[in-house]
Amino acid sequence: MDLEQEEVILMKLQAENIFFSYGSKKILENCSLTLTPGKLTVITGPNGSGKSTFVHLLGGLLQPGAGEVLLDGKNLKSFSHIERACRIGVLAQEKLPALDFSLSERIMMGRFAHLPRLFEPGPEDKKSVEEVMDFMGISSFGTALCNQLSGGEYQKVLIAALLARKTPIMLLDEPTSALDPAGALRCMEIFRLLKSETAIALVTHDLTLAAAFADELILVNKGRTFAAGTPGEVLTKENIAAVYGCNAEILVSSTGPVAVFR
């Protein structure tokens, strides 16, 4: 199953030595990363380590106190919010209430950055919505309204809305947290499929998914990058013990890696 690209635009997003604080409370210190098409970057770490703030800074939803975020070498602050929305798609962890929109209406909202103000969606927009509904396997939801869906079903609709925008960069904060194991696996397979033409970073607490799908894994702890590299380099027993305070190891079986906590 393919998700047709309207136009392939390859872009690079960089965070260089960024710092961020809420008042006197330091949230992130000296964090850097580079997102490019061809690799899936996964950010993980304990609760409160700054992962969501990192995503908000990368998407331009927050401004760093020091350092900078660069989009193809230009400071992200130099882009208008419409220009950013056409280039960077963000799925935040905080969700708006699921109101009584139809599935297609809610997914069409993901296309708004492409639409001139006060203009109706065109055939290409409607085609994109139909494509992502099939791609995400939610066409079977039928005529259900968003507020009639389960949390996991609605999460699939939100991911579909992000995919419908077809941005060259996607940032997703805990996209699989509300999904059952089969749904989480399917979504990660979709992100892996899209990475060849899309720069993708996502946050997850699931170390098994991180080990199985990450090309680059960033382990954040107390606002700092504790370790970065391949899953094998990052998810060592020593690193997991230091960051999470428990014993765990990544076991590799015939079906893939599994995080085992002891």
Report the location of each language-model feature.
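Helix-to-loop junction immediately C-terminal to a conserved catalytic motif
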Residues: 59
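Conserved structural motif at the start of ABC-family nucleotide-binding domains
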Residues: 13, 27-30
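Conserved ABC transporter NBD signature motif
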Residues: 67-75, 84
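The feature captures the beta-strand-to-loop junction immediately N-terminal to the Walker
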Residues: 44-46
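Catalytic Walker B motif of ABC-type/P-loop ATPase nucleotide-binding domains
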Residues: 170-174
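ABC ATPase nucleotide-binding domains
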Residues: 237, 242-262
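Conserved ABC ATPase signature
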Residues: 119, 145-149, 153
